From Swiss-Prot:
<feature type="binding site">
    <location>
        <position position="68"/>
    </location>
    <ligand>
        <name>Fe(3+)</name>
    </ligand>
</feature>
<dbReference type="GO" id="GO:0019557">
    <property type="term" value="P:L-histidine catabolic process to glutamate and formate"/>
</dbReference>
<dbReference type="GO" id="GO:0005506">
    <property type="term" value="F:iron ion binding"/>
</dbReference>
<feature type="binding site">
    <location>
        <position position="173"/>
    </location>
    <ligand>
        <name>4-imidazolone-5-propanoate</name>
    </ligand>
</feature>
<dbReference type="InterPro" id="IPR005920">
    <property type="entry name" value="HutI"/>
</dbReference>
<feature type="binding site">
    <location>
        <position position="140"/>
    </location>
    <ligand>
        <name>N-formimidoyl-L-glutamate</name>
    </ligand>
</feature>
<dbReference type="GO" id="GO:0008270">
    <property type="term" value="F:zinc ion binding"/>
</dbReference>
<keyword id="KW-0963">Cytoplasm</keyword>
<feature type="binding site">
    <location>
        <position position="313"/>
    </location>
    <ligand>
        <name>Fe(3+)</name>
    </ligand>
</feature>
<feature type="binding site">
    <location>
        <position position="315"/>
    </location>
    <ligand>
        <name>N-formimidoyl-L-glutamate</name>
    </ligand>
</feature>
<keyword id="KW-0479">Metal-binding</keyword>
<feature type="binding site">
    <location>
        <position position="140"/>
    </location>
    <ligand>
        <name>4-imidazolone-5-propanoate</name>
    </ligand>
</feature>
<dbReference type="InterPro" id="IPR032466">
    <property type="entry name" value="Metal_Hydrolase"/>
</dbReference>
<comment type="similarity">
    <text>Belongs to the metallo-dependent hydrolases superfamily. HutI family.</text>
</comment>
<feature type="binding site">
    <location>
        <position position="313"/>
    </location>
    <ligand>
        <name>Zn(2+)</name>
    </ligand>
</feature>
<dbReference type="GO" id="GO:0050480">
    <property type="term" value="F:imidazolonepropionase activity"/>
</dbReference>
<feature type="binding site">
    <location>
        <position position="68"/>
    </location>
    <ligand>
        <name>Zn(2+)</name>
    </ligand>
</feature>
Length: 407
């Protein structure tokens, strides 16, 4: 790759629309590393003979980060959509053997190739919206072989597509049918066999649990956290989505990277998150799709200065969402977040939720040149338009990996 100066651009280096540089330039060396950025008029003479890329006044932001997804799974759950419209609750569907467990059956039945092809089709719309880093959870296998299969597919997506994939082991997502009535025995399997084996195989970057009355108890969640800590793996948590179970305070005790959903989070939980440096990951797609009415405590999170991230929560049952830009709009319209909040929520704060704030979510000297080029007049348009293709170009490591074709 030739050293290149990207110029005639409007730069938002940290995802905050109030911190921008008009008529900016970014100098990227042959390794794909940013070696200079700032006002084009101040470009050092040493870069005068480098190759030039004129962006014609387009906006440039860091590559976006989708920090909570369940992208790898078999089948769909379209049939449950009609049930919910008829008034059946998500919890009741789960008790009837639907919900997560129905996806477990489909995922176990699918081979790796099938799972890869299906997940790749879900990933590509996100990449076309400027996503350069994504988290992918397991949790639809619920046995060692199937969880391994999911995590292997997630790793393969990162190898085959221009995106950084971070894997999360979510073995404690639901109770598999063969362990009905034996939740503690299943947690034994998760902690003593599944997690150690998959971690030793290099398939796990973090560990998550679904802590809820239809999921796992605080005591069971803590056992998984202890097992992850022994392996030196960071933890995160699905918490307070359907009730205030106290999971967020537990997550904070283990200095979790993030606590996610949080509709029923109280002020004590918010204070614990702030003290621990835990990021609040809000998932408006799930809130919208299952027609929740309890809003997450945005004002409390603001009051205590807890960083807020947004993610698609792409999954087959509660958020079949393949657009991080639509997530921005939902964050504004449903959760009453501001444009600066939602933009930082898919850049620097989303990177922090993955424990990767040093690699993603900002454009700085010394970092890899991962950025998105936007055909908008203002950054507010990223959260304003619904369904319009706004991403003109995606650059990863200084190389263009996506360019929208016009006409």
């Amino acid at each position: 790759m030739k050293p290149t100066v990207w110029h005639h651009l409007r730069l938002c280096p940290h995802g905050h629309p109030d911190e921008t540089i008009d008529d900016a330039a970014i100098a990227v060396d042959e390794t794909g590393t940013i070696v200079w950025l700032g006002a084009f008029s101040a470009l050092p003479h040493g870069y005068a003979h480098w190759q030039r890329e004129d962006l014609h006044g387009a906006w440039v932001t860091p590559g976006l980060v989708d920090c909570h997804t369940h992208l790898v799974y078999g089948g769909t759950r379209a049939d449950e959509f009609a049930q919910r419209l008829a008034g059946v609750s998500y919890e009741e569907i789960a008790r009837q053997g639907g919900g997560i467990v129905s996806t477990v059956r489909a995922t176990r039945a699918a081979d790796e190739t099938t799972l890869f092809v299906q997940a790749a089709a879900r990933l590509q719309p996100l990449l076309a919206e400027g996503v350069s880093a994504i988290e992918i959870k397991s949790g639809y296998g619920l046995d060692l072989a199937s969880e391994r299969k999911m995590l292997r597919v997630a790793r393969q997506l990162g190898e085959r597509f221009p995106v950084s994939v971070y894997t999360t082991f979510l073995g404690a997502h639901a109770l598999p049918p063969e362990y009905a009535g034996r939740a503690d025995a299943y947690i034994d399997e998760v902690c003593e066999r599944m997690l150690p084996t998959l971690a030793d195989e290099g398939l796990v970057d973090a560990v998550d649990v679904f802590c809820e009355r239809i999921g796992f108890s605080l005591a069971q969640t803590e056992r998984v956290f202890e097992a992850a800590t022994r392996r030196g793996l960071p933890v995160k948590l699905h918490a307070e989505q359907l009730s205030n179970a106290g999971g967020t305070a537990l997550a904070a005790r283990y200095r979790a990277l993030s606590a996610d959903h949080l509709e029923f989070l109280d002020e004590a939980g918010v204070e614990a998150m702030k003290a621990a440096g835990t990021v609040a990951v809000l998932l408006p797609g799930a809130y919208y799709f299952i027609r929740e009415t309890q809003l997450p405590p945005i004002e409390l999170l603001r009051k205590h200065g807890v960083p807020i991230a947004l993610a698609t929560d792409h999954n087959p049952g509660t958020s079949p969402l393949e657009s991080l830009l639509l997530t921005l709009n939902m964050g504004c319209t449903l959760f009453r977040m501001t444009v600066p909040e939602v933009l930082q929520g898919v850049t620097r704060h989303a990177a922090a939720a993955l424990g990767r704030a040093d690699r993603h979510g900002a454009l700085e000297i010394g970092r890899q040149a991962d950025f998105a080029v936007w055909s908008v007049g203002s950054l507010a348009e990223l959260a304003y338009w619904i369904g319009r293709p706004l991403c003109e170009q995606v650059v990863r490591g200084g190389a263009t990996v996506f360019r929208r074709m016009n006409g």
